[in-house]
């Protein structure tokens, strides 16, 4: 009998998620059982951990398990566990709301593309709500370990749910699915065995199914519980015994991802330290990858006992996309997040796991370029953070980077620094790069003209973080990285000696013109000079090596920080007819208008915008009129 009953409305995000999920995931509806068994397994893990300090929570029943049963007459399927259970407040928090920051933004990002939405929802993690894919009503009966009051939760998956106090003799949770008429296929022992074998064989505790016993005459004589999975934690088994399918299903259990992982590494270390690690590289970025409030990390086990989810201290922030677990014998069972932060063992494990993760990415890049490209497209921006965070592994991290390049004529980031170095021209001493707002802007930059003419490859960097990256990554494989937008650009042995001699002569010829232009601009530009880097364009702007670049100034602005004003060097192409024409002008007003127009054009090419575009248009119309 139930008491203290109340009906509550779902959080709006839950209602939206339920509707989207039911329609988007229906083609793979059997995953509901994987999700519910996975939740039951987590509940058992949490009880084991809490019982370390309070064994009375076992209530005399320390044999933890998950049980699956069905009733053909009632049309119900029940998943039961004797894990940690929930009290009334926890039921409302966990089943009536989604306690994930950014949920609203995530749901708003979903559109009408069902295939795409199903992938996104899979990344979000469907969990308990997957029950509504096959059920038109779900009943939950639960009692928290160590408490006497049990709770009933019930909903048809629409606008509201009911919660009430009930009696329940045993701790743990029963999830009862009232199946839709068209979903009665799941009221079959054979079908349930098939699904559990496929998705939950790796669960580290017994999954039992209610089966019929038969006597010697072949007649049904009663019901019994039969264990139908291996019930051995997958990571404790030998690698040789585990199939790829089992590794992938364990990944989905661990991460609640809807997709297979790209690659994994399963390692057991013995000696000074003893631990087992199982690391996975996902194929799709989680929707909250850039949410700083969201914890990302490995599952931590100590001596096979679950301790915590998202133990972020074992992976650096730039590897926060890695999924997996660590099972160690070297930490105490009562370890806390605070203890982990200050622990020498933690630091040693973190260094080892970081190295293992980077080696895994190197293996993926070497063995399967297509899969690595998938990884890079999803997680490249995050990995780039590593050159500023992890000095010890900087070169190894940089070797994993991929860039667009003038060599490939494509915006796809496929070129590694090793590829570039391998193609460097004889006499070339630097790795040349260009940063811009977009690939199109980079590809069409006038700064490339000389390099295109000489056939020198340039890396085209257009991610917002790239300017920060090259600030930390000054060399690779002994070769300095050099921006081609710097005023003191040095081509070394690749320079054209004849052109340099010609330019010296032109310097004398254009001397008074340069002084005149410098006088007009005054403090607005650092200096006005002739340049050898242009072939088709009359002018560009550049910055000195010690000056903040345009892209860095934009990065500051995007973060809401005030950046120092960028002072440019104004470089003019003495072979361009427009420059020659302006140099010959004697009318001061016309000279000022034309030189200003050239400067504005150069600024527009460099920055993509002007502070006063209306004045630019007015000036251009005046000169064209």
UniProtKB/Swiss-Prot annotation:
InterPro entries tied to this protein: HATPase_C_sf, Heat_shock_protein_90_CS, HSP90_C, Hsp90_fam, Hsp90_N, Ribosomal_Su5_D2-typ_SF
Region (C): 555-625
SMART domains in alphabetical order: HATPase_c
Gene Ontology terms, MF aspect: ATP binding; ATP hydrolysis activity; ATP-dependent protein folding chaperone; unfolded protein binding
SUPFAM superfamilies, per database record: ATPase domain of HSP90 chaperone/DNA topoisomerase II/histidine kinase (SSF55874), HSP90 C-terminal domain (SSF110942), Ribosomal protein S5 domain 2-like (SSF54211)
Protein name: Chaperone protein HtpG
Gene3D superfamilies found in the cross-reference section: 3.30.230.80, 3.40.50.11260, Heat shock protein 90, C-terminal domain, Histidine kinase-like ATPase, C-terminal domain
One cellular component (GO) term of this entry: cytoplasm
Region (A): 1-337
Source domain of life: Bacteria
Subunit composition and interactions: Homodimer.
Role according to the record: Molecular chaperone. Has ATPase activity.
Localisation: Cytoplasm
Record region (B): 338-554
Family of this protein: Belongs to the heat shock protein 90 family.
Main localization (coarse): cytoplasm
Keyword Hydrolase: no
Gene this protein is translated from: htpG
Keywords: ATP-binding, Chaperone, Cytoplasm, Nucleotide-binding, Stress response
HAMAP family attached to this UniProt entry: HSP90 (MF_00505)
Lineage per the UniProt record: Bacteria, Pseudomonadati, Pseudomonadota, Gammaproteobacteria, Pasteurellales
């Amino acid at each position: 009998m139930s008491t203290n009953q109340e009906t509550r409305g779902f959080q709006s995000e839950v209602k939206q998620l339920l509707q989207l999920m039911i329609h988007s995931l229906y083609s793979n509806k059997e995953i509901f059982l994987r999700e519910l068994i996975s939740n039951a397994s987590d509940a058992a893990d949490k009880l084991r951990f809490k019982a370390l300090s309070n064994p009375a929570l076992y209530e005399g029943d320390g044999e933890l398990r998950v049980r699956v049963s069905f009733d053909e007459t009632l049309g119900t399927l029940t998943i039961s566990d004797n894990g940690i259970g929930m009290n009334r407040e926890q039921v409302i928090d966990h089943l009536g709301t989604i306690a994930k920051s950014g949920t609203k933004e995530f749901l708003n990002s979903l559109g009408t593309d069902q295939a795409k939405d199903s992938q996104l929802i899979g990344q979000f993690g469907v969990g308990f709500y997957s029950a509504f894919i096959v059920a038109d009503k779900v009943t939950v009966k639960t009692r928290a370990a160590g408490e006497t009051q049990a709770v009933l939760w019930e909903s048809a998956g629409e606008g509201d749910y009911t919660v009430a106090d009930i009696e329940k003799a045993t701790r743990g949770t029963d999830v009862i699915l009232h199946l839709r008429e068209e979903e009665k296929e799941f009221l079959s022992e054979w079908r349930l065995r098939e699904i559990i074998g496929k998705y939950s064989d790796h669960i580290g505790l017994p999954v039992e199914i209610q089966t019929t016993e038969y006597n010697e005459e072949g007649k049904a004589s009663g019901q019994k519980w039969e264990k139908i999975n291996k019930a051995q934690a997958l990571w404790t088994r030998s690698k040789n015994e585990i199939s790829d399918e089992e590794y992938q299903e364990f990944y989905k259990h661990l991460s609640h991802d809807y997709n297979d992982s790209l690659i994994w590494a399963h390692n057991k270390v013995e000696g000074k330290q003893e631990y087992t690690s199982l690391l996975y590289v996902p194929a799709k970025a989680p929707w909250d990858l850039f949410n700083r409030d969201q914890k990302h990390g490995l599952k931590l086990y100590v001596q096979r006992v679950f301790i915590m989810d998202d133990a972020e201290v074992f992976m650096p922030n730039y590897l926060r996309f890695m999924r997996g677990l660590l099972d160690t014998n070297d930490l105490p069972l009562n370890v806390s997040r605070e203890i982990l932060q200050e622990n020498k063992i933690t630091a040693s494990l973190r260094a080892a796991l970081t190295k293992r993760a980077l080696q895994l990415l190197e293996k993926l890049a070497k063995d399967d370029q297509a899969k690595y490209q998938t990884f890079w497209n999803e997680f490249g921006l995050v990995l780039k953070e590593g050159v500023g965070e992890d000095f010890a592994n900087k070169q190894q991290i940089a070797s994993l980077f991929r860039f667009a390049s003038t060599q490939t004529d494509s915006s796809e980031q496929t070129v590694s620094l090793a590829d570039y170095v391998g193609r460097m021209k004889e006499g070339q001493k630097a790795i040349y790069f260009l940063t811009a707002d977009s690939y199109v802007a980079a590809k069409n930059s006038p700064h490339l003209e000389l390099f295109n003419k000489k056939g020198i490859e340039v890396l085209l960097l257009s991610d917002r973080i790239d300017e920060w990256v090259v600030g930390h990554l000054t060399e690779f494989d002994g070769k300095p990285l050099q921006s081609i937008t710097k005023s003191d650009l040095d081509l070394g042995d690749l320079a054209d000696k004849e052109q340099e001699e010609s330019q010296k002569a032109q310097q004398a010829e254009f001397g008074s013109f340069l002084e005149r232009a410098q006088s007009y601009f005054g403090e607005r530009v650092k200096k006005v000079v002739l340049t050898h880097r242009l072939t088709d364009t009359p002018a560009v702007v550049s910055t000195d090596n010690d000056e903040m670049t345009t892209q860095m100034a934009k990065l500051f602005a995007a973060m809401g920080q005030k950046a120092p004003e960028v002072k440019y060097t104004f470089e003019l192409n003495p072979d361009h007819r427009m420059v020659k024409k302006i140099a010959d002008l004697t009318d001061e007003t016309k000279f000022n208008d034309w030189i200003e127009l050239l400067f504005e054009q150069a600024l527009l090419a460099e920055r993509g915008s002007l502070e006063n575009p209306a004045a630019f248009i007015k000036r251009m119309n005046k000169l064209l009129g």
